[in-house]
Design a protein with these regions (language model features):
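Residue-level preference for non-acidic, small/hydrophobic
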Residues: 53, 67, 72, 96-99, ...
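Short, surface-exposed loop or secondary-structure junction motifs
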Residues: 130-342
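A short, well-structured edge-of-sheet supersecondary motif
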Residues: 53-84, 88-90, 179, 323-325, ...
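Short, gly/Ser/Thr-rich active-site loops of penicillin-recognizing serine hydrolases
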Residues: 328, 370-389
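Short active-site loop at a secondary-structure junction
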Residues: 59-64, 81-146, 197-207, 274-277, ...
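Short N-terminal segments immediately surrounding and downstream of signal-peptide cleavage
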Residues: 41-58
Length: 389
């Protein structure tokens, strides 16, 4: 029996990440006594899981949610509010798992090494003065691994403040939808100050510029677009039916995002994210994807251990190589009843994670930009219900 005192803990957390947790959020975890047991899904168990989603939708912060998980041969899917199980939604920075998978596939094919300098693939004009820290130019020292692990020291073009004093995130959530190109994202990055020299021990800084560069590297090596690479390496092999890179401004298929109580209509921005956050998917498709990612169906499974080289990035998350670690601190999880998860999440409230300890794959979204933290609470509550006897 895994027991935790009946208490409700509140933890104020400040983050720098664009698509995981922004600003200051309160992570509230209410623990009760639970037992670890898995077996056949009962009607009562299904109802308890559905109740978690029903209660998540309050029509104030969350208007719709969709989640799915797999434990061994047990699969459950549910939705609530204005979303259905098969409703496509923006997965935001969870897209980075797609980018990571493609990079690792290219590595397996011998087309790149994680230690390659990115100058091998990126034009000099793009790299020129990209990373100047304490009057030294480190631009030519950046490697693919630095980008994947957010240890490049590059600032975040999306969440960092520009010359206007506002971040792109601020501008977009205030209603100023806008386009940007890869080149513009990098130019914006150059106008900001790097945080540390590439590969500084114990240092990591979440930056979408890293994955903009990785997307360009993928296109340079393959001579194909990022979307074409996603189709070739991931979507077609896995038989995903509702997963694609958002590129068409007139595409109304994905569920509109919410920012606080209002719909957030930002098609221009969503077509601009690309390799750092532009994918659309469903919980059904994402469950297939996250299992494939961690079981060797997309790249050699032996790579997974290598990816787990953790650096603190924003509490309670840690950054590995292309993946994140979500692990509650001991004070809030003294018996380890809530397992750690590895995967990724996004500002939209989307996430895709795997619990190695429990062999649980879980994906979903709360589709709320102002409260992406709620998706983590939902993930924890679903896991608790699944583990209750």
């Amino acid at each position: 029996v895994l027991s935790i005192p009946h208490s409700c803990q509140a933890l104020n957390v400040t983050t720098n990440a664009k698509k995981t947790m922004t600003k200051i959020f309160t992570l509230i975890i209410c623990f009760g006594i639970m037992q670890t047991t898995f077996g056949q899904m009962t009607t009562e168990k299904e109802k308890s899981l559905q109740t978690v989603l029903d209660k998540t939708v309050d029509n104030k912060k969350v208007f719709g949610t969709s989640f799915a998980f797999k434990k061994d041969t047990l699969i459950w899917q549910g939705s609530a509010g204005n979303m259905t199980i098969d409703q496509p939604y923006f997965i935001a920075s969870t897209t980075k798992l797609f980018t990571t998978a493609i990079i690792l596939k290219l590595r397996a094919e011998g087309k790149l090494s994680l230690d390659d300098k990115i100058s091998k693939y990126i034009d000099k004009s793009i790299l020129s003065e990209l990373h100047i820290y304490k009057e030294k130019d480190y631009s030519q020292e950046l490697t693919i691994k630095h980008l994947l692990s957010h240890t490049s020291g590059l600032p975040d073009y999306f969440q960092g403040k520009g010359t206007s004093g506002k971040s792109l995130e601020n501008e977009i959530t205030e209603g100023n939808d806008q386009f940007w190109t890869f080149e513009q994202a990098i130019e914006r990055t150059k106008k900001m100050t790097p945080l540390f020299a590439p590969g500084t021990k114990g240092k990591a800084n979440y930056s979408d510029a890293n994955f903009q560069l990785l997307g360009k590297i993928i296109e340079t090596i393959t001579h194909k677009t990022y979307a074409e690479n996603c189709n070739e390496f991931i979507i077609q092999p896995l038989g995903l039916t509702k997963t694609y890179l958002y590129q068409d401004l007139t595409d109304k298929i994905p569920k509109k995002l919410y920012y606080k109580s209002n719909e957030l209509n930002i098609p221009k921005a969503m077509t601009s994210f690309g390799a750092d956050g532009g994918m659309v998917s469903t919980s059904t498709d994402m469950l297939i994807f996250i299992e494939a990612f961690f079981t060797g169906k997309l790249f050699p499974s032996t790579y997974i251990d290598e990816l787990q080289e953790w650096n603190n990035i924003f509490f309670p998350m840690q950054s590995g190589i292309g993946i994140h670690l979500f692990k509650l601190p001991w004070i809030f999880n003294p018996t380890g009843a809530v397992p750690y998860f590895i995967g990724h999440s996004g500002l939209s409230g989307a996430l895709a994670y795997f619990s190695p300890k429990e062999n649980i794959f879980i994906v979903g979204t709360v589709n709320q930009v102002s409260h992406p933290d709620i998706s983590f609470k939902t993930m924890i509550k679903l896991t608790q219900q699944l583990k209750k006897k």
